[in-house]
């Protein structure tokens, strides 16, 4: 039986976005909105949908966690040998999307993607909880087939024996950070009657950003 949602409606009335009052830098607005999401206790405000597309022209999307906002983009960490890592190796273009229902906001980020410095990746890996470090070694190759959950648990237990709590877990060479260097970023604020506010920043040749309002 089909599920019909055509009668479902929600009026967005929690905010507004004015082109004349936004900062020159999109990163200032990104940080401000992220701060508000944290203050409003949005669950997992750092969670973003990451869309990639490999040489096969088949798009893939999944949730990853934002770990840093830099002066040129955003950083997340993952397994370089994962499906997303293979996509990125074949096509260094990606998009990320934050959606915060509680604030009736979304942020769409487009840009080129590349690995960050290996030392920086290692430094972050060593900051992670011990068991998360161990779990990274279990997921190799990430998205690879496994016979059962028991096999995963046994591998995890063996690695915990090899690297007991307090022992240094080596940083995997197959794991690290990526940075999306922003070329375009859109801020969306829900409004009543589908008259949503959409302000997009576009990176110019000289590195500055221009803004424009888009129709909802």
Curated annotation (Swiss-Prot):
Enzyme nomenclature, EC number: 1.4.3.5
Domain of life of the organism encoding this protein: Bacteria
InterPro entries recorded: Pyridox_Oxase, Pyridox_Oxase_CS, Pyridox_Oxase_N, Pyridoxamine_oxidase_dimer_C, Split_barrel_FMN-bd
Pathway noted in the entry: Cofactor metabolism; pyridoxal 5'-phosphate salvage; pyridoxal 5'-phosphate from pyridoxamine 5'-phosphate: step 1/1; Cofactor metabolism; pyridoxal 5'-phosphate salvage; pyridoxal 5'-phosphate from pyridoxine 5'-phosphate: step 1/1
Note on how the cofactor is bound: Binds 1 FMN per subunit.
Subunit architecture: Homodimer.
Protein name: Pyridoxine/pyridoxamine 5'-phosphate oxidase
Organism: Psychrobacter arcticus (strain DSM 17307 / VKM B-2377 / 273-4)
Taxonomic lineage of the native organism: Bacteria, Pseudomonadati, Pseudomonadota, Gammaproteobacteria, Moraxellales
Gene: pdxH
């Amino acid at each position: 039986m089909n599920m019909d949602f055509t009668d479902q409606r929600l009026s967005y009335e929690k905010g507004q976005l004015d082109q004349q009052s936004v900062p020159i830098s999109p990163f200032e607005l990104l940080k401000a909105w992220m701060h508000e999401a944290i203050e409003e206790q949005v669950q997992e405000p750092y969670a973003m949908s990451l869309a990639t597309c490999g040489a096969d022209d088949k798009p893939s999307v999944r949730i990853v966690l934002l770990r840093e906002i830099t002066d040129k983009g955003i950083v997340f960490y993952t397994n370089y040998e994962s499906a997303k890592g293979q996509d990125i190796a074949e096509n260094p273009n990606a998009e990320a999307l934050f959606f915060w229902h509680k604030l009736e906001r979304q942020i769409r980020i487009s840009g080129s993607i590349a690995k960050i410095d290996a030392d920086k990746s290692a430094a972050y890996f060593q900051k992670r909880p011990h068991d998360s470090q161990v779990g990274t070694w279990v997921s190799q190759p990430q998205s690879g087939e496994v016979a059962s959950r028991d096999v995963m648990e046994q591998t995890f237990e063996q690695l915990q024996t090899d690297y007991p709590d307090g022992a240094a877990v080596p940083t995997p060479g197959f794991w690290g950070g990526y940075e999306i260097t922003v070329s375009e970023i859109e801020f969306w604020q829900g409004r009543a009657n589908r008259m949503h506010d959409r302000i997009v920043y576009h990176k110019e040749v000289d590195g500055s950003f221009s803004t424009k309002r888009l129709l909802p």
